[in-house]
Curated annotation (Swiss-Prot):
Gene: cysI
Main function: Component of the sulfite reductase complex that catalyzes the 6-electron reduction of sulfite to sulfide. This is one of several activities required for the biosynthesis of L-cysteine from sulfate.
InterPro entries tied to this protein: CysI, NiRdtase/SiRdtase_haem-b_fer, Nit/Sulf_reduc_fer-like_dom_sf, NO2/SO3_Rdtase_4Fe4S_dom, NO2/SO3_Rdtase_4Fe4S_prot, NO2/SO3_Rdtase_4Fe4S_sf, NO2/SO3_Rdtase_FeS/sirohaem_BS
Gene3D superfamilies: Sulfite Reductase Hemoprotein, domain 1
Pfam families reported for this sequence: NIR_SIR, NIR_SIR_ferr
Tagged with keyword Transmembrane: no
Top-level class of the enzyme under EC nomenclature: oxidoreductase
Any coiled-coil regions, as ranges: none
Protein name per UniProt: Sulfite reductase [NADPH] hemoprotein beta-component
Catalytic activity: hydrogen sulfide + 3 NADP(+) + 3 H2O = sulfite + 3 NADPH + 4 H(+)
Family recorded in the similarity comment: Belongs to the nitrite and sulfite reductase 4Fe-4S domain family.
The species this protein was found in: Salmonella choleraesuis (strain SC-B67)
């Protein structure tokens, strides 16, 4: 056991109620099938409320009208969020046309939401349309299995449109990892696809009868781009190439961003380097990491159940050695790799295969027909003629991939005619928010609806200080769960209450440093006042090429988080230099 962090391999104590629920669920069936036929409520009852998450759904309601409905003695307007499993974010144009139609015909909001998990979500699916959405996805070769709850979630892969061969190889591994770590229960097929029940006992050789202690996230990343924010994830395979061909991966384990306000047992953490592995060991190593976390993760306290906490409790070396034992390998030393950025390159780029790729900026990932900007219709029209594929990025944007020279002008005209290609500032391109209100039940403050106007104000500050073409990686998340990845931003806003946020500073542009809380529970005017002063200093005092986050650390404005298990919460509201 590590001398630095000695602790038990298994946490003893009363199991959380989620563990009971999983054990009693009959491999994730529960009584979901019966609940579907209950027309007295628009939601799912009892354990089914949580069990549907294993099937890719969350039960939500419209919080904008919750109080109004309560006054009318009505239950909340329940509706489901469904998240598709889409390893690497690649979707065919045929599949896109199907999801476009479903969103228009069968959801309350009529939108498609691209997420920073490199997939799409439907919001506002009424109970009567839950089974049809799964059947629609199946009809075009998609599913929503294991995109939520205590499983390996959608596997991310760098959206690299330039080096087509390397991207293709990395993407294939993302798919293989996703398939290898899927649950084996037939519950999904039986409930949603009406497949016949088989008179055999379900087995889960990798995930186990009670699945994982907590959600688990995996990435495949191609340096020098860190577009998938590897340090937000439990398990990361960093592609190592020789002469443009993939030869193996560096493995990093134990990243994660979610915290709980005021709970100092929770913290954001960057992933730890384990070592290098040749390609042929990839699936064995992935399985070994997952099963080690399955067996050693904390099942008594879900707030302390993620892989990052397991590593801190047992020690990185102990966890790594167990992975080696289970996989039957010894990691080689980490091979050199470097990240230089994580934003998407908006506009056209030409790949080495001579095909063109058009990256479209989709603010907050929300695809809808807005007045004067019919984005959803535009993408549908492109999907009808495009013979390549679409790629959803981890920055909530969309790539029209593999466009031949002969189609380039036609696709660009469609994009421009529908408001999909507009001049966008570097600051807006590098700003992102989670959904939050009105649909997320965990939301404490606005995020998606807040960010566009807030970005306008930050742009005005940059203009005021003579640096309008600069950018700061900025993220807003409506609660401390961290879906907006604010804990890897240069400016991170974390919702605390309606209209109030914690302001975190000191991350960097490449996403390898956790920002520290600078001010707590403050309003938008307070945030903007602080940013005005700090950005003014950055504009005058920065070194050549120095990003805002690096400047705040170098200038002593914020102390960097060096060892989050011990110093993430240190010196709240600390201002080490006058601003």
């Amino acid at each position: 056991m590590s001398e630095k962090h000695p602790g038990p391999l298994v946490v003893e104590g009363k199991l959380s109620d989620a563990e009971r629920m999983k054990l009693e669920s009959n491999y994730l069936r529960g009584t979901i099938a019966e609940d579907l036929n209950d027309g007295l409520t628009g939601g799912f009852k009892g354990d089914n409320f949580l069990l549907i998450r294993f099937h890719g759904m969350y039960q939500q309601d419209d919080r904008d009208i919750r109080a109004e409905r309560a006054a009318q003695k009505l239950e909340p307007r329940h509706a489901m969020l469904l998240r598709c499993r889409l390893p690497g974010g690649v979707i065919t144009t045929t599949q896109w046309q199907a999801i476009d139609k479903f969103a228009a015909d069968n959801t309350i909001y009529g939108s498609i939401r691209l997420t920073n998990r490199q997939t799409f979500q439907f919001h506002g699916i009424l109970k009567k349309n839950v089974k049809p959405v799964h059947q629609m996805l199946h009809s075009v070769g998609l599913d929503a299995l294991a995109t939520a709850n205590d499983m390996n979630r959608n596997v991310l892969c760098t959206s690299n449109p330039y080096e087509s061969q390397l991207h293709a190889e990395a993407y294939e591994w993302a798919k293989k990892i996703s398939e290898h770590l899927l649950p084996r229960t037939r519950a999904y097929a039986e409930i949603w696809l009406d497949q016949e029940k088989v008179a055999t006992t379900d087995e889960e050789p990798i995930l186990g009868a009670t699945y994982l202690p907590r959600k688990f996230k995996t990435t495949v990343v191609i340096p020098p781009q860190n577009d998938i924010d590897l340090h937000a994830n439990d398990m990361n395979f960093v592609a190592i190439a020789e002469n443009g061909k993939l030869v193996g991966f560096n493995l990093l384990v134990g990243g994660g961003l979610s915290i709980e306000h005021g709970n100092k047992k929770t913290y954001a953490r960057t992933a730890s380097e384990f070592g290098y592995l040749p390609l042929e060991h990839t699936l064995a190593v992935a399985e070994a990491v997952v099963t080690t976390q399955r067996d050693w993760g904390n099942r008594t306290d879900r707030k302390n159940a993620k892989t990052k906490y397991t590593l801190e409790r047992v020690g990185v070396d102990t966890f790594k050695e167990e992975v080696e034992r289970r996989a039957g390998i010894k990691f080689e030393p980490i091979r050199p790799y470097e990240f230089t950025g994580r934003g998407d390159r908006i506009g056209w780029v030409k790949g080495i295969d001579n095909n063109w790729h058009l990256t479209l900026f989709i603010e907050n990932g929300r695809i809808l027909d807005y007045p004067g900007r019919p984005l959803k219709t535009g993408l549908l029209e492109i999907a009808k003629i495009h013979q390549g594929e679409f790629r959803i990025t981890a920055n909530q944007n969309l790539i029209i991939a593999s466009v031949p020279e002969s189609q380039k002008a036609k696709i660009e005209k469609l994009a421009r005619d529908h408001g999909l290609m507009n001049a966008v500032s570097a600051q807006r391109e590098n700003s992102m928010a989670c959904v939050s209100f009105p649909t997320c039940p965990l939301a404490m403050a606005e995020a998606e609806r807040f960010l566009p106007s807030f970005t306008d104000k930050v742009e005005a500050i940059l203009e005021k200080h003579g640096i309008p073409d600069e950018h700061i990686v900025m993220r807003v998340t409506g609660c401390p769960n961290g879906c907006g990845r604010a804990m890897l931003a240069e400016i991170g806003l974390v919702g605390k209450a309606p209209g109030r946020y914690n302001l975190h500073l000191g991350g960097n542009r490449i996403g390898t440093r956790i920002p520290r809380m600078y001010q707590e529970n403050i309003t938008e005017p307070d945030i903007l006042a602080s940013l005005d002063q700090l950005i003014g200093r950055w504009a005058k005092e920065r070194e050549a090429g120095e990003g805002f986050g690096d400047f705040t650390v170098r200038a002593g404005i914020i102390r960097p988080v060096l060892d989050p298990a011990r110093d993430f919460w240190d010196n709240l509201n600390c201002r080490m230099a006058s601003v």
